[in-house]
């Protein structure tokens, strides 16, 4: 499979590194690729007119491979960013817009004979309005960091676990994160998640160079930082999406992934940004959001160099 790319939001190979099988060091819910990538995705849900757009960019700025390494490990510096804009029909007492922005600097390198480690630092912005003017330092801007250790079981499987550091509550907090990835021949499977942003997983098969198909499960979480009754709060929205994701390759660099499925459950809750209550209860007296299953459709474009 030289110079091929197999997607379910997963694998990439670049021309100069045909012997490097892959790099699945997951930071938050984004993979790190060995080649530059730009992707755009639009999500449409059947109820409440929910519409979401997402733009992601990742650019490796320095990349080295290890000669004769049995686990195809690499050393890489990369910069990345992600933008999510979400909007639905207005509901009294609940945010109907959400803007999540992030930017990170990442470094991955081998450790010992069969390990790698990943570090990252960056910023995250979580606002209840899709306007850049709604960004306010001290209100909805937080610092992010990560440290993950990755065990390369063999050439087909790797497992990673570590911590995310986030100033969600106004001071550094540590949250767990983990992933597992497997690839053998045309088959691939992966799962990843963390406390703050939920999780995703997929099982897929590449039928031919221009076509692959995955079964995708997505329980991602989106956040909006705001004031509720004069107190600092965060509004979380979580989906439970299951669907089929066909991916069509057009030419050398372009991929068109689709997802057709159902949002089995969508809920939204307020949490006060205070340690004593954040993990145990919702914001007292605040409304909650809950919807029955709805159709889900997503279309995207990926450009990989």
Descriptions of predicted regions:
Residues 37-138, 142-146, 233-241, 296-304:
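Transmembrane beta-barrel domains of bacterial outer-membrane proteins
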Residues 38, 67-72, 113-117, 155-160, ...:
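Repeated loop/turn-to-beta-strand initiation elements of outer-membrane beta-barrel proteins
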Residues 47-52, 137-139, 165-175, 190-201, ...:
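Solvent-exposed loop/turn segments connecting transmembrane beta-strands
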Residues 40-48, 81-89, 123-129, 163-169, ...:
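Transmembrane beta-strands of outer-membrane beta-barrel pores
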Residues 81-101, 195-282, 286-297:
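Outer-membrane beta-barrel translocator/channel fold
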Residues 147-150, 160-164, 171-176:
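Surface-exposed extracellular loop regions of Gram-negative outer-membrane beta-barrel proteins
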Residues 1-40, 305:
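Bacterial Sec-dependent N-terminal signal peptides
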Residues 177-185, 246, 290-305:
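Outer-membrane beta-barrel "beta-signal"
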